[in-house]
Amino acid sequence: MALYGNFERSLDPKNRLSLPAKFKTELGSNFYLSVLLDGVVEIRNSEEFENEAHKFKTMNVLDKNARDFARLFFQRTVEVEADKQGRFVLPKHILEKASIQKDVVLVGMGDKVELWSKAKYDSFQDSIDDEKIENIAFKLKESGVEF
């Protein structure tokens, strides 16, 4: 799966969002929305969701952090179904957790799509410059991540 690029969209009055054609094919008509890190909605197709959910089955149940994270992951995940036009309803609790009001940005992240409130996305983009990108890349390389 190769999800990439970013697309700006707006919710309609019924809190429906239309997926870009590029993402519709990869995500299918049923997919999962999760809000955990950075207040960003992660959208996964069924296969990727099952892969992610499987990781929790292998966690140490004696580790409180692992239990808490698993609870949050499953509590903050919802399955949605897109209509024939590729629109789906964003549930109220997802909108609230992600601070989404109307305008959003969908960002392809390889195996998933991130859904940002436009205001939060713009703020993130404004905080990034070439020097920060180099620093991030250097720190990742130091921790063993290869590019």
From Swiss-Prot:
Gene3D superfamilies: Transcriptional regulator MraZ domain. This is Transcriptional regulator MraZ. It comes from the Bacteria. Forms oligomers. One of its GO terms (molecular function) is DNA-binding transcription factor activity. The lineage of its organism: Bacteria, Bacillati, Mycoplasmatota, Mycoplasmoidales, Metamycoplasmataceae. Signal peptide: none annotated. It comes from Mycoplasmopsis pulmonis (strain UAB CTIP). GO terms for biological process: negative regulation of DNA-templated transcription initiation. One of its GO terms (cellular component) is cytoplasm. It is found in: Cytoplasm, Nucleoid. NCBIfam families: division/cell wall cluster transcriptional repressor MraZ (TIGR00242). The keyword Cytoplasm applies. Keywords: Cytoplasm, DNA-binding, Repeat, Transcription, Transcription regulation. The keyword Acetylation does not apply. Residues 6-48, 77-120 form the SpoVT-AbrB domain. Belongs to the MraZ family.
